[in-house]
Design a protein with these regions (language model features):
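Non-catalytic, solvent-exposed segments at the cell envelope interface
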Residues: 1-481, 485-487, 491-492
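Alpha-helical structural elements
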Residues: 86, 504-507
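Small-residue (G/S/T/A) turn/hinge positions that recur once per unit in extracellular repeat modules
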Residues: 120, 390, 498-504
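Surface-exposed interaction regions enriched in Ser/Thr/Asp/Glu
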Residues: 189, 445, 521-529
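Solvent-exposed, conformationally flexible loop/turn segments
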Residues: 345, 440-444, 507-522
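Surface-exposed interfaces of beta-sheet-rich extracellular modules
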Residues: 492-498
Length: 529
């Protein structure tokens, strides 16, 4: 760390230590294997199992030791391969603007391609996301149908290729478009929200850019990112307009300044805080990593770093917003309430209510999709993902707003409601309910959904005990989702436990309220007569 992250000195020291650690762990695993053969014998019983029973555990001390060593070996091997000590690895980094929200965290503002060769960054190239591909976009794939009609785009552009909430699929789509236009295939895709990048600026406290006197605070950097301060700077190498102006110019200068700051070394007091920040933003899915190499993929899947939609055999919910270009989410807040009436041996009744509030001043005119003033309307294609057990879904029409481009061009189909049972791209089995929702300034819009869950969504445990489990997955880039989850037990049921600790238990209702900052699992264990 003192040499600077990804500097030549750091790379040399990291390579030496990782290589030595690999050797130590390999030796330890071999010795554990030999000890197991000695203790367990050919019959599979022996001293190890006796120790496990004596200590009251299901795993023997050798099992636990071997699992710990294997986990450590996997982590070391991940770093060894990721940093390019086996061969050079090329990655694409995406800066996603969470204010113009998209399923994986936000509109892609810029992309950086870099290669890690034995721990050293080489071949660093920064792209404006709007300049990776070019009209008439003949190399770009066809977009999904709802993107065609509501973004008014005949091709899936690089900057919009992250429209799948399953980040591994979005990463593959982004990498494919990038390869078609640049001829460069990458080994993985990393993404971070601009808010996370600003947090790093605030953490260091001494980052500077060419167009601002002195070090940047997080607040000042955010004003530049939002275009609230005029900026004139240097921009990325190869820019046609130098010096450059505006918030994109600031983004580029800030990127190179942060790279250089990391290379200069990380002071001891900052190291722990930086590691904690990275861990927290990965937990919140504001920092995502998906790698295509089979040697690297297992760890990011197991840790959840790759923002994958997780297939489950119980209840599931994910709410996703897709803001249209130029329309910022920061003016609109989203909350939702989910109520489930649990039953035994018959379908469960579920009610979901989405609520959007626009904090702008009420309008005296009709807002238009083509008007990019952020405070007028929130133009959003919402998606709700339900489990495969969801049936008999009731949803209201989602009429197109009179200011949409589709109506402006003379199309008469006015209902945008969409229901799809997915079969691929990481969403297999999930049911999607969505629509093109426009929230006018100063208004509140509610979307009610009602459906049934097949009895298989409830897990019987025997002796009259049942487990209801709900996985709620957070949308990357959205840290302010206010939720209510309420589970109503069957009549005469006895509550045996609930996790996490409920906000309240009232009669047959078990209720949680809070702000969704990460994926969350809610469980209710009960017994019936």
């Amino acid at each position: 760390w003192e040499h600077g992250v990804l500097s030549p000195a750091f790379a040399q020291q990291a390579g030496e230590r990782l290589g030595a650690t690999r050797g130590v762990l390999d030796t330890a695993l071999r010795e554990v294997g030999a000890l197991r053969l000695l203790l367990e014998g050919a019959g599979g019983g022996g001293m190890g199992r006796l120790l496990a029973r004596a200590l009251g555990g299901g795993l023997s001390p050798l099992d636990r030791l071997e699992a710990a060593l294997t986990s450590a070996r996997l982590g070391v091997e991940f770093l060894w391969v990721f940093l390019g000590y086996d061969r050079p690895r090329t990655y694409l980094f995406l800066a996603q603007n969470q204010n113009e929200i998209r399923p994986t965290g936000g509109f892609i503002g810029y992309a950086a391609r870099f290669t890690l060769d034995r721990g050293v960054v080489t071949d660093l190239v920064l792209h404006d996301s709007t300049e990776v591909d070019a009209p008439p976009y003949e190399r770009n794939p066809q977009p999904p149908d709802f993107i065609y009609w509501y973004l008014w785009m005949e091709r899936l552009l690089f900057r919009d290729a992250n429209w799948n909430p399953h980040f591994p699929s979005s990463a593959a789509a982004v990498a494919e478009v990038y390869a078609r236009w640049t001829g460069v295939s990458v080994d993985g895709v990393l993404a971070a929200t601009k808010a996370t990048i600003l947090d790093v600026v605030g953490l260091f406290g001494d980052v500077s850019v060419p167009g601002h006197p002195g070090p940047l605070t997080r607040a000042v950097a955010e004003e530049y990112v939002e275009g609230q301060r005029p900026y004139t700077g240097r921009g990325r190498p190869g820019r046609s307009d130098t010096p450059c102006t505006g918030k994109r110019c600031f983004d580029e200068d800030l990127f190179f300044s942060l790279v250089e700051r990391l290379r200069q070394g990380v002071p001891l007091p900052v190291r722990g805080a930086l590691a904690a920040l990275v861990g927290e933003q990965a937990r919140r899915k504001n920092l995502l990593v998906h790698l295509f190499d089979p040697a690297l993929a297992p760890l990011v899947w197991e840790t959840g770093w790759n923002g994958a939609v997780r297939p489950v055999d119980h209840d599931y919910l994910m709410v996703v917003d897709n803001a249209l270009p130029g329309h910022e989410r920061k003016w609109a807040s989203r909350s939702w309430e989910y109520r489930v009436h649990v039953a035994v041996d018959r379908p469960l009744e579920a009610d979901l209510r989405l609520r959007y509030i626009h904090r702008g001043a009420p309008l005296q005119e009709v807002c238009r999709q083509a008007d990019w003033r952020a405070s007028t309307c929130y133009w959003n294609f919402f998606q709700v993902f339900l489990p495969r057990w969801a049936t008999e879904i009731e949803a209201p029409p989602v009429p197109l707003h009179e200011g949409t481009e589709r109506l402006a061009w003379g199309y008469t189909e006015g209902d945008s409601l969409r229901m799809v049972r997915h079969r691929g791209e990481g969403l297999t089995g999930l049911v999607e309910v969505g629509g093109y929702l426009t929230v006018e300034a100063g208004t509140v819009v509610t979307v009610p959904l009602r459906y049934r869950l097949a009895p298989e969504a409830l897990r019987p445990l025997g002796e009259g005990r049942y487990l209801y489990r709900l996985l709620v997955q957070k949308q990357p880039g959205v840290d302010d989702d206010h939720y209510t989850v309420a589970v109503r037990l069957p009549e005469d049921a006895t509550l045996l436990g609930a996790t996490p600790s409920p906000t309240r238990v009232a009669g047959r209702w078990v209720v949680w309220r809070g702000t969704l900052t990460a994926d969350a699992t809610f469980e209710v264990l009960f017994r019936t007569p």
